[in-house]
Amino acid sequence: MMFYYQVQDEVLVSREALAGVREITEEEASKAQRLIFMSRRVGAGKAAWLVSHKAYLAEAEEGLWCLDSNQQDVLARQVQDVPQWLEEKIAAGGVMGVCADLAQTQELLARKENADKKVVHILAMGDVGSTVLMALALLGGDCVRELGIYDFNERLCQRWEHEINQIAYPWAYDRLPAVRVLTEDQLFQCDVFVFCASKSIPAIGADVQDVRMAQYEANSAIISRYGVLAREAGFQGLFAVVSDPVDQLCCSVWRASNRDAMGNWDGEGLRPEQVQGYGLGVMNSRAAYYAKQDARFQSFLTEGRAYGPHGQQLVIANSVTHYDHALSMELTRLTVEANLEIRALGYKPYIAPAVSSAAISLLLTLRGEWHYSSNFLHGIYMGAKNRSTRNGLELEALPLPPQLLARLEAVAAELEKY
């Protein structure tokens, strides 16, 4: 049974009766421009998301079914009480799901997103951070108003402020976003915070097979501190993780922000969906690079997908509709080892990740377009194709072949260890 309620300008749908709000008829609810579906799994996942399939009304725990339309169809058949008009509203993208109680839901709905160009702040002006800055400055004029930068090295910040602000189109001097040097207490006065800090990157020639995981312990401590600062600032924007290992650091910052001063979990920090990891975009681009060079992989360019972390657990599918396990594993290996080829040439492989994974993917996020990033999924952060909508995060769901699904299950099991 469904209950319908009017709360200010929003219409809520719930399977449980709610006290203290005005109940309305189903006919009245059906006329609403959008609906807010209140899940009974309070605090068990993302606070808000797009209900993109009837399966979400089954209120199952988040999991890989969110990426698999086969499993979604099975779950949807368990939901018997959904009126036709509500199914049509879901198909049109007009239903937001919330995993919160009534008070938290009202607080979420009261937040008004900045509809104008965004303010983006970047932490750390090393190789990666400075490249992200350049790419955002040159490519983001349509959706970024200002770029704030912070680094412990003040001279480094001054250098980049001078350099980037002296790049301009003649007679269109405000076409590109301005760059401003920040103090640490200003870091979270923004719409998007981009974490590019890193304790250390293994030197060229170092005998390290998985460079990204070698950075985990040190970078986890750093990002946890900024999770606490985000909590203290009451930050409501997007916390974008660029440093390696991306997916594991997403978990680190989310957890750190939700513990009190005594280390006890209280859930008062960043919401799961506020944290996104930006590492998968370059792996998709690297797979496309090899697909262009070898006709055996050509199907990837139109039918392929990338999933998971951008490290040893990466999952590349040559095609979802015509999945070939052997080809997919070979293309995955080539993609994972692409950074080692750059290191063998004597260079650190940071330019393509900074632009493909971070800058381009961040801009696609702000524009509400499909891109690759890592998002919260039942306690882990899993990379997949997704987009941000007015009604929450939408994860792409495809009919995943059994062998591909098995690979994703193995990856999820590994990520659960962190």
Regions found by a protein language model. Give the residues of each.
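N-terminal ligand-binding/catalytic initiation module
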Residues: 1-116, 362, 366-369, 408-418
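Long, compositionally biased stretches enriched for glycine and/or charged residues
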Residues: 47, 53-76, 292-418
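Hydrophobic/small residue at the entry helix of a nucleotide-binding pocket
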Residues: 127-132
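Short beta-strand element of Class I
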Residues: 144-148
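Conserved N-terminal Rossmann-fold NAD(P) cofactor-binding segment
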Residues: 152-190
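Rossmann-like NAD(P)-binding element
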Residues: 175-236
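Rossmann-like dinucleotide-binding core of oxidoreductases
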Residues: 243-319
